[in-house]
Amino acid sequence: LLGKFAREFIFQIPELLKTEKNPNPTASMVTNGYLLMFGPEHADEQYKALENHKACEAGTKNIKGSELSKIFPYINNEGIETATFTDNKSEGWIDPFMFHSALKSKAIELGAEFIKGEVKSISEIKAKTIISAAGCWTKKLLEDIPVVPQKHTVFRVKCPKHIPEMPLTGDLTTGVYWRPEGGEYLAGSPNSVFCLLYTSPSP
């Protein structure tokens, strides 16, 4: 349900976040959908999850592993028992910078004040609600908050053939994921910390 709300909000950005300085806000959503693939060990769990998706009218469909290559010829379905895919243009990804810029512009128009500066310590703040937006640096300000920085490596891959309509694809048997980005692809895996010896460009 939260995802449905987010989707509806994203689609309404041109109206909801329109400002005098930013009359045409957008998050540049790419509605290629999500394709998630599961092995036999997670199939039953995913069938149950799919029932929940249907109850929420998410539009998620089940695809048998044996049928995958007929729909997505570039997919090797070896070891895949089942997959889920949403093909109703309701799922995809956005440009986070453009989205945050639109939110900031609207907040300023509504009276928000953005103060640039470096906060090195906090003594006492009286407020009903405090939101920390320090991200991975949160622990420097709030030592008791269990947030620590962690580096993740995402690869940009260029292939001879580009498939712009490809969905964001996740192979849950390996954890590897990828999606198109411009004329290339972004790809990653659970093992997201790599030795520089293997990731640095060749001399």
Language model region names:
Residues 1-71, 175-177:
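Dinucleotide-binding Rossmann-like beta1-alpha1 core, especially the glycine-rich loop
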Residues 36-52, 106-114, 120-124:
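Feature captures the FAD/FMN-dependent oxidoreductase FAD-binding
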Residues 35, 150-155, 174-176, 183-185:
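Small-molecule pocket liners
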Residues 129-167:
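Central helical "cap/lid" subdomain
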Residues 198-203:
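Conserved small/polar residues in nucleotide/adenosyl-binding loops
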Residues 35-40, 85-91:
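Short beta-strand and adjoining strand-loop segment in the mid-core
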Residues 88-120:
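Helical element adjacent to the flavin cofactor pocket in flavoenzyme catalytic cores
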Residues 160-194:
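Mid-domain catalytic core of redox enzymes
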